[in-house]
Amino acid sequence: MSNLKKLKIIKPLKEYLENNSSYLGICVGMQILSDWGYEDKITRGLGVISGDIKKFRNKKLIIPHMGWNTINLNKDDTIITNSFDKKDFYFVHSYIFQNIKKSNVLAFTHYGQKFPSIVKKGNIYGVQFHPEKSHKHGLSLIKNYILKS
């Protein structure tokens, strides 16, 4: 958020998102959609999808969570279809979306604890994993987003 502030793009980005414009946030691009982030210090997010970004709670985990992991769909839609359920995607992260409404979670993943891996509000999507590094399933997700958003 500090870099977005330095670049003076927080206001235009919020205006863009408030118009329910199409957006796909990847990793940190998803995390900035939250209300608050708790990395080095408490930081206000864009507040588009209510919730907080906090570090994994399980101290026994290897952090960052790096590698392939399965997503489990809560519900599908035009972009995130049933074809992605139980498929592996590539993750690299230490922080997760918490205190989020279930209605905003399209998919979750388990890594020591259950966490949202795909979130949505209107035309705004966020994915915690890296679809660009996730082989055919990731490319399929990006293709769906481009063609259907």
Question: In which residue ranges do the predicted regions lie?
Answer:
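Alpha-helical elements of Rossmann-like donor-binding domains used by nucleotide-donor carbohydrate transfer enzymes
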Residues: 12, 114, 140-144
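Acyltransferase
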Residues: 124-149
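Histidine-centered divalent metal-coordination motifs
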Residues: 27, 93, 130
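Pocket-forming structural segment of enzyme catalytic cores
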Residues: 11-15, 35-111
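Short, conserved clusters of charged catalytic residues that mark active-site
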Residues: 8, 75, 137
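Short, surface-exposed beta-strand/loop micro-motifs that present aromatic residues
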Residues: 113-120
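A residue-level structural signature of the nucleotidyltransferase/glycosyltransferase Rossmann-like core
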Residues: 22-25, 45-46, 63, 88-89, ...
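Flexible gly/pro-rich beta->alpha loop and the following alpha-helix that scaffold active-site loops
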Residues: 1-25, 30-44
